[in-house]
Amino acid sequence: MNPITMKLVVDDLILQALREDITFEDVSTASVCPTARPATVELIAKADGIIAGLDVFARTFELLDPQSSVLFDVSDGDEVHAGDHVGQVRGDARVLLSGERVALNYLQRMSGIATYTHRMVAALEGTKTVLVDTRKTTPGMRVFEKAAVEIGGGSNHRYNLSTAVMLKDNHIDAAGGVARAIEMARAHASFTTTVEIECENLGMVREAVEAGADIIMFDNMTHDDMAAAVELIAGRAKTECSGNVDANNIRALADLGVDFISSGALTHSAPILDLSLKHLRLLDGK
């Protein structure tokens, strides 16, 4: 992540996670390390996958003690295998022990998302289709989870509700129809704001094209209807399909010729990548 995002957004989130975990005192660490003692601990991969979130991992220790340092053997986006040495953390043993869980939580979560995304993107090779995420993220984790999607080779859909207009079924109901919803969005939003609308059938797609939507999402439409919708739109709007996307069907969806495939599973269903901090070694000889 860029330094500005790290300072303005990420630091506060990491500190909140540390406060949640440590609160008043790490009683286990205080019991065995009552005073500062220099130490190292090794970061080891326990499964195969794509690494993501190294800067967040390191920053977790730095926020506890600016004198902490991390030396990595890999970079974000690199593939690791079970047993690989990923890096070494150096600093006060109390900091290494107290920050371990929060730092690993971020790294495991982000690496899991990057690994899952990488697998899905590989299925799209040779097509024009771009895999994008959704807002189905863990509360308080969006900035990390969306960064992990990008590291895994995917792209980000809108970051939040202010980024773009996305008219869903309830918006359409509130406006009184597809065309009216698009008309109202154009009247309210800046001319620079993209207007996307969710369609459930070909009739809605036809109305959305005629009303001038920028992006038309096919939400849980049948394969045949989506193929017909792409032909109907004929390049007059960008196309996106969504709903129950997985590694088994993503290629068939891309072969329809859609511009984007969105998948909430990238962030809500990706398993963590198992990583561990092992072999803490005290450096003071005591």
Identify what each model region corresponds to.
Residues 220, 243, 264-265:
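Short secondary-structure boundary segments
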Residues 265-286:
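Short, charged, intrinsically disordered terminal tails
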Residues 219, 237-241, 281-286:
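Short, structured secondary-structure boundary patches
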Residues 2-211, 215, 227-232, 238-241, ...:
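Acidic/glycine-rich phosphate/pyrophosphate-binding loops and surrounding catalytic core
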Residues 1-4, 284-286:
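Basic/polar N-terminal segments that are highly enriched at the extreme N-terminus
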